[in-house]
């Protein structure tokens, strides 16, 4: 008999529990099973197709609730809320599954974000139905049929969920002064807002440190945030300190961390980057989310890819008990996550190519190709290429992301490719190229090193 992966896990968990060992997923009464997504960015009805696909997956897995950590509507329009409600009702009407939704920045002001405005008008919508203009409370309560407030407490199967709406950090701090004693018992509870908490998960925060300071008094807190659109392939998406924080990836598209040659840059056509923008952004790929299961103070987080409809990476598991180990604390990850490794015999191949740079200008590029690296138990975060002068002067350092950085590992190319604009390279001096693969905490592989190279003077004579 051939068992599906899910059947195997159910059977395996039952056997593990019977023998006194914790299995990889939790089964049975008393559990909380929670679907978690973020940044669904609904525009017109067609844009809700991925959200509906995620909802149907969560229904098939018997969730008790589905949490969306903000940016429900791309343009902050009432129609976006209504499309979400219609999508929810098609899947969950009459099931008792609880919606746990909050607002993000787009739900308040996406209707005046430059290019968003162009798209909105092109598709036949306008700011006259902006929820913030019509009244956020009114739009929310009329659409979703539930009370809206800057801070809300909702309970699902005995587990508390405290939500903090966009811009409501101060209200949350005051609310916790009056209500924080409720969460002192040690049972896991969830805090969720749109932007990350400073000093926790990857990405830039858009909030006040005061919220983090409050949560530091609750080791049983699991904080869920969205906003940054980073994929869960980045293992900095989970953080443990005085509490646990998890960054929820976007269900609509992934974005790239700053500082990479094939990442984001000037959008006015004045970019000076040589490499083209990764297609993952143009193709709007990277639809990801979580299935969280809780039993007692034990938590398992399944990372799911809704493009491929399969697990996108290995589970995270931890305990919220006060004296429990913190396996996802940054200092532990830095120490224990191994450096990437290139395949045995890997070589760096270098040639030149005629191409256009990001701004569309003709460029001669040094075309560097080498095999993809791997890191045990995780993914390579990025690659660093250095042009290192032999005379000890300052090297030229560039970083780039694999074109599959936001996708499942099976899409990782066998060969990575990087372009240097030859005008940037050392002239009239010897240098070598060094290539390093790095994990998300900055630990680097041993380098691939080119033969010694020497550029000749004369690049200044070229017409550019």
Spans of features found by a protein language model:
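A short C-terminal boundary segment appended to hydrolase-like catalytic domains
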Residues: 28, 271-403, 447-448, 453-464
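Active-site neighborhood of phospho(di)ester-bond hydrolases with catalytic His/Asp-centered motifs
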Residues: 37-38, 66-71, 99-105, 190-194, ...
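Short acidic, glycine-rich surface-loop motifs adjacent to enzyme active sites
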Residues: 184-200
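Extended active-site neighborhood of metal-dependent phosphoesterases/phosphodiesterases
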Residues: 78-185, 210-217, 233-249, 253-279, ...
């Amino acid at each position: 008999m051939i068992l599906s992966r899910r059947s195997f896990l159910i059977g395996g968990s039952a056997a593990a529990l019977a023998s006194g060992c914790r299995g990889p997923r939790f089964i049975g009464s008393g559990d909380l099973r929670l679907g978690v997504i973020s940044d669904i960015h609904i525009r017109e009805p067609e844009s809700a197709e991925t959200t509906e696909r995620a909802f149907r997956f969560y229904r098939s897995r018997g969730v008790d609730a589905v949490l969306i950590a903000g940016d429900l509507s791309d343009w902050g329009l009432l129609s976006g809320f209504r499309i979400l409600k219609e999508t929810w009702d098609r899947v969950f009407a009459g099931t008792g599954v609880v919606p746990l939704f909050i607002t993000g920045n787009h739900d308040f002001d996406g209707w005046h974000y430059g290019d968003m405005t162009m798209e909105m008008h092109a598709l036949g919508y306008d700011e006259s139905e902006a929820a913030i203009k019509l009244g956020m409370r009114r739009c929310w309560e009329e659409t979703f049929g539930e009370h809206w407030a800057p801070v809300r407490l909702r309970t699902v199967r005995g587990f508390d969920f405290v939500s903090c709406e966009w811009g409501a950090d101060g209200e949350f701090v005051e609310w916790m002064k009056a209500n924080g004693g409720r969460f002192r018992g040690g049972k896991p509870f969830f805090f969720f807002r749109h932007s990350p908490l400073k000093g926790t998960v990857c990405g830039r925060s858009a909030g006040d440190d005061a919220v983090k300071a409050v949560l530091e008094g609750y080791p049983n807190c699991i904080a869920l945030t969205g906003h940054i659109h980073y994929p869960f392939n980045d293992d900095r998406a989970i953080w443990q300190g005085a509490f646990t924080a998890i960054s929820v990836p976007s269900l609509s598209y992934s974005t790239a961390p700053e500082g990479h040659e094939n990442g984001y840059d000037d959008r006015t056509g004045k970019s000076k980057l040589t490499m083209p923008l990764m297609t993952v952004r143009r193709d709007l790929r990277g639809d990801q989310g979580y299935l969280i299961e809780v039993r007692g103070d034990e938590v398992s987080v399944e990372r799911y890819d809704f493009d491929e409809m399969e697990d996108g990476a290995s589970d995270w598991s931890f305990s919220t008990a006060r004296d429990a180990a913190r396996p996802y604390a940054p200092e532990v990850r830095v120490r224990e996550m191994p450096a990437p490794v290139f395949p045995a015999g890997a070589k760096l191949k270098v040639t030149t190519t005629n191409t256009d740079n990001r701004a569309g200008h003709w460029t001669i590029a040094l075309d560097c190709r080498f095999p993809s690296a791997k890191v045990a138990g995780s993914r390579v975060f990025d690659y660093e290429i250095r042009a290192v002068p032999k005379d000890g002067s300052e090297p030229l350092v560039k970083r780039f992301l694999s074109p599959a950085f936001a996708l499942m590992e099976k899409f990782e190319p066998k060969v990575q490719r990087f372009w240097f604009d030859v005008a940037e390279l050392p002239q009239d001096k010897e240098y070598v190229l060094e290539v390093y693969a790095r994990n998300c905490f900055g630990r680097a592989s041993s380098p691939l090193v080119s033969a010694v190279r020497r550029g000749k003077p004369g690049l200044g004579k070229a017409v550019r």
